Amino acid sequence: MTQGKLSVANKAPGTEGQQQVHGEKKEAPAVPSAPPSYEEATSGEGMKAGAFPPAPTAVPLHPSWAYVDPSSSSSYDNGFPTGDHELFTTFSWDDQKVRRVFVRKVYTILLIQLLVTLAVVALFTFCDPVKDYVQANPGWYWASYAVFFATYLTLACCSGPRRHFPWNLILLTVFTLSMAYLTGMLSSYYNTTSVLLCLGITALVCLSVTVFSFQTKFDFTSCQGVLFVLPMTLFFSGLILAILLPFQYVPWLHAVYAALGAGVFTLFLALDTQLLMGNRRHSLSPEEYIFGALNIYLDIIYIFTFFLQLFGTNRE
């Protein structure tokens, strides 16, 4: 009769669920494991393996899901982005407020620069004694050009003087006065009607480009390749014209050069305007208000001078 008994106590590993009856093995029905008791579940002792499903693995956090504090890490160095990241990784109300204050500060400085330049151009255009003096003394032109070039390199290449008050405003004032003198002397060689006409055209073009840059979805800051090739083309074209000028003056070549220059700096105006906005691929740091005003001011001045070459009429 012992053969007919179930061998439970002495069964070998791996023979669970089997019975040995009259020398024959039969499958026993599977019995579900009993759930743990309340004490086992709460104390964690004696918990059977497989009693509960394993906990799901943690989902790795994507960097774009986490808030990054803009004050803790900035992706800018000397006013230019070091990569393809924006200055602000999140655009909260405070970030937008900082950007609006930055844009307001840039355009306030730009307005003062343009008013000073307009006053100098009007003085050199309408006052005959001043106009005759600056044309008779070209040395002041070259001195102003040297000051302009030195201050421009300092403001463009050195982040220290550009960001520290009051040196940034002093350098920008000297730069603006020297550039205003250069623009005024150039305007003195054209008649008053041409100067006024080019001023009006420049104002309309710059206003239209500024409004377009703020409204369009096209990102000019992602076109660095094109905006590098065009100035190189303009530079070599000007070099060829400078070589040909002592031998022969070709009016249509100068007209093409002036049109190309006006177009290139119009594109640069759109680029520099979008750099202020902060919602493009690249944007300026809010600390770079001097650099932003400097770039837009130069764009407007160069557009005006190229329009003078294109539409202006020399004085008789």
From Swiss-Prot:
| Gene expressing this chain | FAIM2
Q: Any stretches that span the bilayer, and where are they? A: 106-126, 138-158, 165-185, 194-214, 225-245, 250-270, 290-310
Gene Ontology cellular component annotations, sorted alphabetically: endoplasmic reticulum; Golgi apparatus; membrane raft; postsynaptic membrane
How does the protein's chain sit in the membrane according to the entry? Multi-pass membrane protein
Per the record, the major location class is membrane
Entry similarity comment: Belongs to the BI1 family. LFG subfamily.
Subcellular location, in the record's words? Cell membrane; Membrane raft; Postsynaptic cell membrane
The protein's name is Protein lifeguard 2
Which keywords annotate this record? Apoptosis, Cell membrane, Glycoprotein, Membrane, Postsynaptic cell membrane, Synapse, Transmembrane, Transmembrane helix
Pfam families according to UniProt: Bax1-I
Question: Subunit details for this protein?
Answer: Interacts with FAS/TNFRSF6 and BAX.
Report the glycosylation sites.
Answer: 191
Q: Which InterPro entries match?
A: Bax_inhibitor_1-related
Write out the function statement from the record.
Antiapoptotic protein which protects cells uniquely from Fas-induced apoptosis. Regulates Fas-mediated apoptosis in neurons by interfering with caspase-8 activation. Plays a role in cerebellar development by affecting cerebellar size, internal granular layer (IGL) thickness, and Purkinje cell (PC) development.
Please list the GO biological process terms of this entry: apoptotic process; cerebellar granular layer development; cerebellar Purkinje cell differentiation; cerebellar Purkinje cell layer development; cerebellum development; negative regulation of apoptotic signaling pathway; regulation of neuron apoptotic process
Give me the ranges of the annotated region Disordered.
1-53
PANTHER family registered for this protein in UniProt: BAX INHIBITOR-RELATED, PROTEIN LIFEGUARD 2
